[in-house]
């Protein structure tokens, strides 16, 4: 059976060699037909601690690494949100009176 691959956002990188990845999916409600979002968090192995908060990453199912870790980060899809925060700070400093 092929390995499952999911794409999600890193929500925590505080633990050593582990990141928490939030994976969202959209499902149709069985009775009402409305499209609703469902999410699940996975602990994924990050050997070199190279992925940070806000990164969109691809994770791949592996053999169990620990009690809760059965996924490993394969690669980065989109860089994280720290660059956007720094850009907002630059704009706030450039405008007189802050970011109004």
From Swiss-Prot:
Keyword rRNA-binding listed? The answer is yes
* Name the record gives this protein: Small ribosomal subunit protein uS17
- Family annotation (SUPFAM superfamilies): Nucleic acid-binding proteins
> Keyword Signal: yes or no?
no
- What gene name is listed for this protein? rpsQ
Q: Name the InterPro entries on file.
A: NA-bd_OB-fold, Ribosomal_uS17, Ribosomal_uS17_bact/chlr, Ribosomal_uS17_CS
What is stated as this protein's family in its record? Belongs to the universal ribosomal protein uS17 family.
Q: Name one GO biological process term.
A: translation
Annotated coiled-coil positions are none
The UniProt keyword set, sorted, is: Ribonucleoprotein, Ribosomal protein, RNA-binding, rRNA-binding
**Which purpose does this protein serve, as stated in its record?**
One of the primary rRNA binding proteins, it binds specifically to the 5'-end of 16S ribosomal RNA.
- One cellular component (GO) term of this entry: cytosolic small ribosomal subunit
Q: Which NCBIfam families match?
A: PRK05610.1, uS17_bact
Q: How does it assemble?
A: Part of the 30S ribosomal subunit.
A Pfam family that the UniProt record links to this protein: Ribosomal_S17
Q: Which GO terms describe its molecular function?
A: rRNA binding; structural constituent of ribosome
């Amino acid at each position: 059976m092929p390995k499952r691959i999911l794409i999600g956002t890193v929500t925590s990188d505080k633990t050593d060699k582990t990141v928490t990845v939030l994976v969202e999916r959209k499902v149709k409600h069985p009775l009402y037909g409305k499209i609703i979002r469902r999410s699940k968090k996975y602990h994924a192995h990050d050997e070199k601690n190279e992925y940070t908060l806000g990164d969109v990453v691809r994770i791949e199912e592996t053999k169990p690494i620990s009690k809760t870790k059965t996924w490993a980060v394969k690669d980065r899809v989109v860089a994280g949100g720290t660059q956007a925060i720094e850009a907002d700070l630059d704009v706030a400093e450039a405008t007189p009176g802050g970011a109004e």
